[in-house]
Design a protein with these regions (language model features):
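Short catalytic/binding micro-motifs of nucleotide second-messenger systems
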Residues: 94-99, 131-143, 175
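Core hydrophobic beta-sheet residues of small sensory/regulatory alpha/beta domains
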Residues: 61-63, 186
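Conserved long alpha-helical elements within nucleotide-processing catalytic cores of c-di-GMP signaling
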Residues: 25-32, 38-60, 67-97, 103-107, ...
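A structural signal for short, well-ordered beta-strand segments
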Residues: 61, 110, 148-152
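Selective detector of the "anchor" transmembrane alpha-helix that sits immediately C-terminal
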Residues: 1-7
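Cyclic nucleotide signaling catalytic output domains
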Residues: 102, 128, 142, 149-157, ...
């Protein structure tokens, strides 16, 4: 009887530990992913970028913003805005690879890490991002055209500081918004004008 009880108790403890580990993994995943889009969130982005910069791995950050998103929410409602975010997120997920990860940064902003700063690969990825916005989205059952502005900054070319790299990509994105939207721009002297 004692042997049976010890075996059962060990089994129960292993099962409990397994359930606790599963719960921890679910909580960790939830803490690092955006609920609406399923993409990794800003916290996960910062952790991943910090690891790359800490290891001195050249990389490129692309900040993406849906043009006139407030107008979508104001005209069609927040449910339609959520639909637009989900559709853009799904397209960005389709682009992901071993060297490209998409994140929901904030509001209608997404951010990508390309684990390369090679100019041809960066440009190819920027054009792929433009295609994400070139396709219509379905809002309330109707197809609508959206646009997106994309800012690009590379480590270590533009800066070797994590926070500054994000600022550089953001500055480049706002340059696009200022100059007509629905395009991409690289951070550089032209963004400082």
């Amino acid at each position: 009887v004692i042997i049976c009880w010890v075996c059962f108790d060990n089994y129960r403890r292993r099962k409990l530990l397994q359930e606790l580990e599963q719960a921890r993994a679910i909580m960790e995943s939830a803490a690092q992913h955006d609920f609406l889009t399923g993409l990794p969130n800003r916290s996960k982005f910062m952790k991943d970028l910090e690891q790359l910069i800490g290891a001195r791995i050249p990389c490129t950050v692309m900040m993406l913003d849906i043009d006139n998103f407030k107008k979508i929410n104001d005209t069609y409602g927040h449910t339609a805005g959520d639909e637009a975010l989900q559709q853009v997120a799904n397209r960005l997920k389709d682009m992901q690879s071993q060297i490209l990860t998409s994140y929901r940064f904030a509001g209608d902003e997404f951010i990508l890490i390309l684990r390369s700063s090679q100019s041809m690969l960066v440009e190819k990825t920027a054009y792929q991002c433009r295609q994400v916005f070139a396709k219509d989205v379905t809002l309330c059952g109707t197809k609508r055209r959206i646009g997106g502005s994309i800012g690009i900054a590379s480590y270590p070319k533009d800066t070797d500081n994590l926070e500054q790299l994000i600022v550089c990509a953001d500055d480049a994105m706002y340059k696009v918004k200022k100059n007509g939207k629905n395009d991409f721009a690289y951070y550089g002297k032209s963004t400082e004008e």
